[in-house]
Amino acid sequence: MEQVKCFIPETLEEALRIRRETGATILAGGSDLMVANSMGAGVTPAFKGDVLIITNLKELKGIRALPDGSVEIGACTTSAEIAASSLVPELLREAASRMGAIALRNSATIGGNIGNASPKGDMPQPLILMDAEVVLTSVDGERRMLVDDYIIATKKTALREDEIITKVIIPKQDFTHTFFRKIGMRRANAISKLTLSAAATVRGGVVVDFRASSGAAGPKVARSRKAEELLIGKKVSELHT
């Protein structure tokens, strides 16, 4: 059996070069990937190919507000860091705070949660609702696309073999009301059976923007477009009668 190589680059530039040359599997927090390749307790996981560990790359960490009001989140920023940041929209903070156990939230990254493309992932749903974009980087440069377009189906994404998810961009949000609900077999440390998200902007008693989606019930997050169209333009007083 051919020996699997493990690469630990010191810079993003080095990581991109290795990714181009080897096509190695990207590993950040490893909360899903380590489980998927587990051989049992106390046994080294058996990866089927080379592994590129990017957890230590400073270029992929941190949260910052941009001049246009959008928020940039590095791909290796953890769920716990996102949940604790006042820069992050409330809808995403709530979803991040609901992910699994505390230990998992301290290791799971936003890039991994998107890249894993699991319909049960907690963070992609609010990201899709907010029209967030993912930045995909290779040695040739960057390209940006909506998270909704990046996740094609269960475990299927638009990531190319030489690319790495480097950041997520959330456009400026002006929602006046947001909602996130996760349904699982228990209150904590649960895998989602169903997730529901909604966000609305109400001005002068009128719904000027409304978005809703569900997750974990299909191959990817589903926007409730018809429900959105029905509510936009309605007076809030009409919705209570």
Show which residues each predicted segment covers.
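C-terminal structural segment of proteins
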Residues: 1-241
